[in-house]
């Protein structure tokens, strides 16, 4: 039979084989070698093995390689909203919160012509944060404050350099340290070192009001190793953030230091606040802080040329509780050496999430300062935390009792701390506070 007569049969056989190959699973030997696009479309093509196919990367391949979101909200960060570069080298975090209060105050013996009862609303403070890092080593923070009268102030503005990463777990802190330059809070007292949102109570204690340095301008270095860490600072001293050049009336220079050691535990995050949320490990922290200040030539007459303080605090924190006790001794050279001291003891306990109860006792003793009496106050309250991952959202109800005539003590009366001017007798307050932000 002529070969030409087999042509239709050969073509038919070839088509059957190719159709069968197309119907086989992709992993079978025939399917692996079948042309792309389906056998029926290529029945007349050469039977030579095809060239290896090259898969072009998709147009958005660069996007698929991005490991970090360029914007979003991070619950693990104090200020959650962020914008960052694709490699996460640059990052900007933004946050804000306010403390809105309704106060009721009773005076046993009001000043002449004054009412024995006062009440009203108050925005105690509003804080706005811009913080982050330019690289993994270079950090920055800007913090604005709006006070109860609506005045704006640049509370914090610093740049920092992290020479070595710091970690919460003590066993990972092998010589971590950094340096911050600019306006910042100074590490002496643990209470004053805390953000207002992270306090146990609605407000700082009267002891803190009398002795705290607050924000100042200068340099502050930090070092952390294993279970110990320390801060060293050279700044323009107490109230230094409110001074200008050349009329610095507060101080010429303040040398300060604070050291902390964990007597029990190895997780520093237990002591990131004074609240003591549930789920934390047991820890005990001992801290010591001190400062020495030299007043400048523009200081008002009668201001001490030399002054200083020493603070010792002990904190115990664990699963749903935290307690703090500290004492501070302050001195000033005003002709003769004058000294005073203060003491704070406080503790809070979560009955259940999200409900916490707390108490605080505070004392300010004038020491050898003449014509003053001792300040005694007791505070009781409760906090409700709707969210487990932040202290920024909080509802508080708090009552306070002052056992002294505040005008005769070292403490300056004002509506923020809750004690109003009075020359005689005790006073009481009831406060409702809504703290909220993002």
Regions found by a protein language model. Give the residues of each.
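N-terminal secretory signal peptides that target proteins for export/translocation
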Residues: 1-10
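Bacterial N-terminal signal peptides
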Residues: 13-26
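N-terminal periplasmic/intermembrane-space "pro-region" immediately following the signal or transit peptide
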Residues: 27-99, 106-109, 169-173, 268-270, ...
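Outer-membrane beta-barrel pore domains
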Residues: 63-73, 107, 114-115, 141, ...
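Outer membrane beta-barrel
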Residues: 80-240, 249-266, 273, 277-279, ...
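Active-site cleft segment of glycoside hydrolase catalytic domains centered on the general acid/base Glu
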Residues: 245-247
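Low-complexity, intrinsically disordered short segments enriched for Gly/Pro and polybasic residues
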Residues: 271-273, 284
């Amino acid at each position: 039979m002529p070969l030409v007569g087999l042509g239709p049969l050969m073509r038919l056989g070839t088509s059957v084989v190719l159709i069968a190959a197309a119907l086989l699973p992709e992993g079978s030997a025939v399917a692996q070698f079948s042309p792309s696009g389906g056998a029926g479309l290529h029945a007349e093509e050469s039977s030579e093995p095809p060239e290896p196919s090259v898969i072009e990367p998709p147009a958005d391949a660069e996007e698929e390689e991005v490991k970090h979101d360029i914007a979003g909200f991070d619950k693990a960060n104090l200020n959650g909203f962020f914008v960052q570069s694709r490699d996460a080298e640059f990052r900007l975090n933004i946050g804000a919160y306010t403390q809105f209060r309704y106060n009721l105050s009773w005076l046993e013996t009001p000043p002449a012509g004054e009412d024995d009862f006062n009440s009203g609303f108050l925005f105690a403070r509003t804080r706005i944060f811009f913080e982050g890092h330019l690289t993994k080593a270079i950090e920055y923070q800007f913090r604005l404050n709006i006070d109860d009268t609506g005045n704006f102030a640049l509370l914090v503005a610093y740049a920092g350099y992290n020479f070595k990463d710091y970690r919460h777990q003590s066993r990972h802190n092998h010589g971590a340290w950094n340096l911050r330059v600019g306006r910042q809070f100074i590490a002496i007292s643990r209470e004053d070192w805390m953000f207002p949102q992270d306090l146990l109570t609605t407000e700082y204690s009267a002891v803190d009001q009398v002795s705290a340095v607050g924000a100042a301008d200068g340099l502050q270095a930090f070092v952390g190793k294993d279970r110990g860490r320390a801060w060293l600072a050279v700044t323009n001293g107490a109230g230094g953030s409110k001074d200008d050049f050349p009329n610095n009336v507060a101080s010429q220079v303040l040398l300060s230091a604070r050291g902390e050691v964990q007597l029990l535990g190895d997780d520093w995050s237990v002591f990131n606040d004074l609240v003591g949320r549930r789920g934390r490990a047991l820890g005990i922290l001992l801290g010591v802080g001190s400062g020495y200040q030299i007043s400048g030539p523009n200081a008002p007459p009668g201001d001490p040329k030399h002054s200083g303080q020493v603070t010792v605090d002990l904190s115990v924190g664990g699963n749903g509780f935290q307690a703090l006790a500290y004492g501070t001794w302050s001195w000033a050279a005003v002709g003769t050496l004058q000294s005073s001291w203060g003491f704070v003891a406080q503790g809070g306990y979560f009955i259940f999430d999200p409900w916490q109860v707390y108490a605080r006792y505070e004392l300010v003793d004038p020491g050898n300062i003449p014509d003053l009496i001792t300040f005694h106050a007791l505070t009781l309250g409760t906090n409700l935390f709707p969210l487990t991952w932040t202290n920024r959202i909080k509802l508080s109800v708090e009552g306070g009792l002052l056992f002294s005539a505040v005008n005769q003590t070292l403490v300056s009366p004002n509506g923020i701390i809750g004690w109003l001017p009075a020359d005689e007798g005790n006073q009481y307050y009831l406060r409702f506070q809504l703290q909220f932000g993002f």
